[in-house]
């Protein structure tokens, strides 16, 4: 059994479905004693893991389901060597919400100096990358950056009373103020190995 918990959210992994069903049942009964219940939409049992894809393929079923946890959609995949990997992409709903907030702020700052807006955007984007720049998520973050460039371009073109700036004129501005994404975190196994190296994993 593997459990990852943060605040009141948790993910539990089991080798056998019966064990997962037993824990869910016990958990529901425990909460009911206090007049509580699990979230009906967020609580579910799914087949996930190293053998999920092959087992489902044998049964004529589709790809393993995904789940969202701590702002990431987790899904089964493989790396360049064909080894099983749990990939994480920024949850689409979460990214749309962030982009909407930034877009609104860009409109509000329409007539502020470019350097002021750019410095603000850079801080926002770097902070976003600090959390979301995990292995396998760069394509999503690249789309995030591309969307921001479009939003800012729209604002800059609207405030110009003369010639509307084109992409060639705006690209250097975007390159200066909106950093391109790069992976900032190792895969979880690397961090875990660094913490337990030289010690028993059973401690």
Residues of each region from the PLM?
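Non-catalytic terminal/accessory segments
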Residues: 1-203
């Amino acid at each position: 059994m593997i459990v990852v918990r943060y605040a009141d959210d948790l993910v539990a992994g089991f080798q056998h479905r019966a064990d997962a069903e037993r824990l869910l049942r016990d958990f529901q009964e425990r909460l009911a004693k206090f007049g509580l219940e699990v979230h009906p939409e967020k609580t579910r049992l799914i087949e996930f893991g190293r053998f999920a894809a092959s087992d489902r393929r044998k049964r004529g079923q589709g790809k393993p389901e995904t789940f969202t946890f701590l702002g990431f959609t987790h899904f089964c995949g493989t790396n360049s060597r064909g080894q099983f990997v749990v990939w994480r992409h920024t949850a689409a709903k979460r990214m749309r919400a962030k982009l909407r907030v930034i877009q609104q702020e860009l409109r509000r700052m329409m007539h502020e100096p470019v350097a002021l807006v750019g410095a603000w955007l850079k801080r926002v984007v770097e902070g976003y990358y600090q959390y979301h720049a995990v292995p396998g998520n760069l394509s999503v973050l690249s789309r995030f950056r591309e969307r921001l460039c479009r939003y800012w371009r729209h604002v800059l073109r609207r405030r110009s009373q003369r010639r509307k700036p084109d992409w060639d004129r705006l690209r250097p501005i975007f390159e200066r103020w909106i950093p391109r994404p790069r992976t900032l975190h190792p895969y979880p196994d690397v961090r875990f190995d660094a913490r337990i190296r030289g010690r028993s994993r059973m401690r």
